[in-house]
């Protein structure tokens, strides 16, 4: 089972709107992952800058990167996330916004936790960054455990930290809320 779990595909969903200033850094953080079995689905949400050109440059370097185009700007990240989940091929679904970055070992450390049959969602603490992309030394602590009712009542998990197992959780759709995380 361990060999199987460590080779399972992770689909990373990245909504993008006018992200030319930072999408390259977000994609680079995915490319640096020590866990190699992933696909990155970047969902373009009608940007007016050259975000798509930047993503296409990365696509030319790595076939695991896919660009999906949303015809019109939805004004919220829920619609692009839902589009990404719909096209995802992986058993595991992870989320990374185009203005966030991951540590290189993020997937390598989180995926083995799914070997416990009771684990359906994995998440962690995260550190905030300032506008210039520098670490702000402000850690947002996640609760050690989140119940189903807590998940229904509000977002206790930092979006960029969460991964869920589709086989255990089933279909997940984001409501059309206006907040990002």
Language-model-derived ranges and their functions:
Residues 1-31:
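N-proximal low-complexity "stem/linker" segments adjacent to membrane-targeting elements
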Residues 21-24, 49-57, 101, 105:
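Acidic helix N-cap motif at the loop->helix transition within catalytic regions
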Residues 44-53, 72-74, 97:
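A conserved acidic beta->alpha catalytic loop
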Residues 70-88:
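Glycine-rich, basic loop-to-helix element that forms the pyrophosphate-binding segment
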Residues 86, 124, 142-181:
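Conserved nucleotide-sugar donor-binding catalytic segment
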Residues 93:
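Short aromatic/hydrophobic "clamp" motif used to bind/position activated sugar donors
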Residues 97-101, 125:
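The conserved acidic donor/metal-binding loop of glycosyltransferases
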Residues 105-136:
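Conserved donor NDP-sugar-binding/catalytic core segment of glycosyltransferases
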């Amino acid at each position: 089972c361990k060999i199987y779990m460590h080779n399972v595909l992770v689909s990373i969903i990245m909504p993008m709107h006018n992200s030319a200033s930072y999408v390259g850094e977000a994609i680079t953080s995915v490319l640096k992952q020590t866990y190699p079995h992933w696909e990155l689905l970047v969902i373009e949400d009608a940007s007016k800058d050259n975000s798509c050109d930047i993503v296409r440059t990365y696509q030319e370097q790595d076939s695991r990167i896919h660009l999906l185009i949303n015809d019109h700007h939805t004004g919220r990240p829920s619609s692009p996330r839902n589009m990404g989940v719909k096209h995802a091929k992986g058993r595991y679904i992870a989320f990374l916004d185009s203005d966030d970055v991951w540590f290189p070992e993020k997937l390598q450390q989180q995926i083995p936790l799914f070997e416990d049959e009771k684990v359906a969602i994995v998440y962690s603490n995260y550190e905030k960054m300032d506008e210039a992309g520098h670490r702000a030394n402000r850690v947002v602590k996640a609760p050690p455990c989140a119940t189903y009712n807590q998940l229904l009542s509000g977002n206790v998990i930092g979006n960029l930290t969460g991964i869920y197992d589709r086989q255990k959780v089933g279909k997940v759709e984001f409501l059309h809320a206006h907040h990002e995380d």
